[in-house]
């Protein structure tokens, strides 16, 4: 395919246009009370998306000018990386990247050496990152969670309370999932054991009529992706379980009517204590779910791919749990012992999830990556043995989906804050690093210019927050920097200047550090771009047309 090549100044100028367009769209979302951005849904007939999340805005923008779109793509990448690694700071990273790229562009226009310029920027960023870590405050868990969550959710204090409950229940690195709820208010469900959304196959399994639950004690667990066709295949196993004084929970791909009738007849008569449910997972994902469950309960998954047969299963193959509670909609296993094998699988899944999050846009199918990551996260929740489900409430679907994004960001921000500490929020956290840059000596004028670019970038988030509040950004920066208190800043909620640290308005130090590092990295890519190579799209309606192929398929390739 033919190529178009765009060189040097022209390439950088058009890329800079794309950076400016995307940044101007995302910048209103910076701050606790910033306005929202309305995005047309890509599917006709569906309501628009209202968001106050920078990465959502960034991902929605694709420009017609393909060179300008490459510039916008740089900011989409930095926002996506921030969202994956820190959960918050996506708009902050966009603001920093835009400022650094803009100042680089000006410096190159007056003849600055790009290598020395980048060296100065890299040295300054490394020094600021080190200083952020040194200044970070690691306070009590409750205060940090409530403060960081309030900032990340744009001022919703109730979210912080529920996140605190969730993390108290499952731990900082425990399994917390954020899901759309069915009510106006947010709800938190903490689940002990292993749970999946498949209930009993017949109401005749119910043992508690008042609550419509089937409850089993001292449970043996049969896990299989095979279909149970004949009740006779289960009889030896049921007899062995009964002799051992236990009950049997059958989690299978499907239980045929003939086998189900035999189970129900003996269960109702009290001959055996047994309940049949559909196994967790779907399709080709089910074997992995069953292997997880087997590792957790100390049993063995009976899998078709391994050539396993139901009539050869013994008591030693079954998993063990203290109690099973089965409703019409879901199955919960309680009192799971856990094993070394389950802990090893859990660590492996966490590593795999991090690898998926680290993938950049364009690496594989975006939809495929999302589905794989969701499946891995669901398996992590199951293997954790205890999980918290945060159900997001709202009046409309649009509101719930917009809040869900912010609450997911808040959760990841809280975890980041507990890992590396916090600094005053509202853009003030960066200002404390200005003195260390003043002490940084440059080797030449262009390196000094690079250090100066980072120094001026540190004030940019605060300036934008001031402008988003209807004030003069420069005046806000000047007033904050003139104050002796390093925690002094502008509180958008109250519309006043105050000690942000004392008021509990914080940003996670990890978020600030990553935002600056990622912004400088992507701006460095822009700085060192000397040429852009593009494919020239073929607009010929008959491109790739083959008469033989058309005749064989009787299809018009232009349709």
From Swiss-Prot:
Domain of life: Bacteria
TM helices/strands, residue ranges: none
A single MF term (Gene Ontology): ATP-dependent protein folding chaperone
Record's catalysed reaction(s): ATP + H2O + a folded polypeptide = ADP + phosphate + an unfolded polypeptide
Keywords linked to the UniProt accession: ATP-binding, Chaperone, Cytoplasm, Isomerase, Nucleotide-binding
Main subcellular location: cytoplasm
EC number: 5.6.1.7
GO BP term (any one): protein refolding
Cell compartments where the protein resides: Cytoplasm
Coiled-coil segments on the chain, per record: none
InterPro entries found in the cross-reference section: Cpn60/GroEL (IPR001844), Cpn60/GroEL/TCP-1 (IPR002423), GroEL-like_apical_dom_sf (IPR027409), GROEL-like_equatorial_sf (IPR027413), TCP-1-like_intermed_sf (IPR027410)
Enzymatic class: isomerase
Cited SUPFAM superfamilies: GroEL apical domain-like, GroEL equatorial domain-like, GroEL-intermediate domain like
Binding-site residues for ATP, renumbered to this chain: 88-92, 426, 507
Subunit structure: Forms a cylinder of 14 subunits composed of two heptameric rings stacked back-to-back. Interacts with the co-chaperonin GroES.
NCBIfam families: PRK00013.1 (NF000592), PRK12849.1 (NF009487), PRK12850.1 (NF009488), PRK12851.1 (NF009489)
Protein task: Together with its co-chaperonin GroES, plays an essential role in assisting protein folding. The GroEL-GroES system forms a nano-cage that allows encapsulation of the non-native substrate proteins and provides a physical environment optimized to promote and accelerate protein folding.
Protein known as: Chaperonin GroEL 3
The organism of origin for this protein: Methylococcus capsulatus (strain ATCC 33009 / NCIMB 11132 / Bath)
Gene that this polypeptide is encoded by: groEL3
């Amino acid at each position: 395919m033919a190529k178009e090549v765009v060189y040097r100044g022209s390439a950088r100028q058009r890329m800079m246009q794309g950076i400016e367009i995307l940044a101007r769209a995302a910048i209103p979302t910076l701050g606790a009370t910033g306005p929202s951005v309305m995005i047309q849904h890509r599917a006709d007939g569906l309501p628009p998306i209202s968001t106050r999340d920078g990465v959502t805005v960034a991902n929605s923008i694709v420009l017609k000018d393909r060179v300008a779109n490459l510039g916008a793509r740089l900011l989409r990448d930095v926002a996506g990386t921030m969202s994956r690694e820190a959960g918050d700071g996506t708009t902050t990273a966009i603001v920093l990247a835009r400022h650094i790229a803009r100042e680089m562009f000006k410096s190159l226009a007056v003849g600055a050496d790009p290598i020395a310029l980048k060296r100065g920027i890299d040295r300054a960023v490394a020094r600021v990152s080190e200083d952020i870590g040194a200044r970070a405050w690691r306070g009590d868990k409750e205060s940090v969670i409530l403060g960081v969550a309030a900032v990340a959710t744009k001022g919703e204090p109730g979210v912080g309370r529920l996140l605190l409950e969730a993390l108290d229940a499952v731990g900082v690195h425990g399994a917390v999932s954020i899901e759309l709820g069915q009510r106006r208010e947010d709800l938190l469900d903490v689940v002990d054991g292993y749970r999946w959304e498949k209930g009993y196959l017949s109401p005749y399994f119910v043992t508690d009529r008042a609550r419509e639950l089937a409850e089993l004690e001292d449970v043996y667990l049969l896990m299989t992706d095979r279909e149970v066709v004949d009740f006779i295949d289960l009889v030896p196993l049921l007899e062995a379980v009964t002799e051992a004084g236990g009950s049997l929970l059958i989690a299978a791909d499907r239980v045929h009517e003939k086998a189900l009738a035999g189970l129900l007849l003996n269960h109702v008569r009290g001959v055996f204590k047994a309940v049949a449910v559909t196994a967790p997972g779907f399709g080709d994902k089910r074997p992995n779910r069953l292997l997880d469950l087997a590792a957790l309960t100390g049993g063995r998954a009976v899998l078709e791919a391994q050539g396993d047969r139901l009539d050869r299963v013994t008591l030693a193959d079954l998993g063990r749990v203290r109690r099973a509670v089965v409703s019409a909609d879901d199955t919960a296993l309680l009192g799971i012992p856990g094993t070394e094998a389950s802990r090893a699988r859990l660590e492996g899944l966490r590593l795999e999830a991090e690898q998926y999050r680290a993938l950049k846009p364009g690496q594989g199918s975006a939809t495929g990556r999302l589905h794989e990551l969701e499946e891995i996260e669901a398996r992590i929740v199951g293997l954790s043995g205890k999980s918290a489900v945060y159900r997001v409430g709202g009046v409309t679907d649009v509101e719930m989906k917009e809040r869900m994004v912010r609450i997911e960001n808040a959760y990841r921000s809280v975890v980041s804050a507990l890992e590396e500490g916090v600094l005053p929020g509202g853009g003030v956290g960066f200002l404390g690093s200005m003195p260390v840059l003043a002490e940084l000596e440059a080797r030449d004028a262009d390196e000094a210019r690079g250090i100066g670019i980072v120094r001026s970038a540190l004030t940019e988030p605060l300036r934008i927050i001031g402008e988003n509040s209807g004030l003069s950004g420069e005046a806000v920066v000047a007033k904050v920097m003139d104050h002796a208190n390093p925690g002094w800043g502008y509180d958008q909620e109250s519309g006043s200047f105050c000690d942000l640290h004392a008021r509990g308005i914080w940003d996670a130090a990890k978020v600030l550090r990553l935002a600056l590092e990622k912004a400088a990295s992507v701006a460095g890519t822009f700085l060192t771009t000397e040429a852009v190579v593009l494919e020239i799209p073929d607009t010929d309606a008959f491109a790739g047309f083959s008469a033989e192929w058309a005749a064989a398929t009787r299809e018009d390739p232009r349709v």
